[in-house]
């Protein structure tokens, strides 16, 4: 296990890892994939990995793509392939922003029916 700086991206379909992280982990590609990013299209390598979130939640056998995200100081970009496995929430109670994620999904969160 290697600690990694990650970004949760609801606009990303899939999860990506930096070229550097793929090398550090000595990953062997399982294939190639054509992808479309905000900066254009590319053919990238695919890998199978286990991702540990918050040192406790393990997401096994995730197909990830290598990416230039290392240029942004990131090791992992977590996309909707992982986010859609569970419940994802952001709150800003008392001026403090908090993020929460759990797998499996347990219920719909809908604040419109909550009395103020």
Question: Model regions: which residues?
Answer:
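Pepsin/retropepsin-fold aspartyl endopeptidases
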Residues: 1-116
């Amino acid at each position: 296990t290697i600690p990694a700086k990650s970004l949760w991206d609801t606009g990303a379909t899939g999860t990506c890892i930096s070229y550097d992280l793929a090398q550090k982990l000595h990953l062997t590609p399982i294939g190639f994939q054509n992808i479309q990013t905000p900066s254009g299209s590319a053919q990238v390598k695919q890998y199978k990995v286990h991702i540990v979130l918050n040192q406790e939640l393990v997401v096994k056998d995730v197909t990830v793509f290598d990416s230039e995200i290392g240029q942004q100081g990131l090791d992992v970009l977590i996309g909707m392939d992982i986010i859609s496995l569970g419940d994802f929430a952001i709150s800003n109670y008392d001026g403090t922003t908090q993020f929460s994620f759990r797998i499996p999904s347990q219920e719909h969160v809908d604040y419109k029916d909550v009395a103020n």
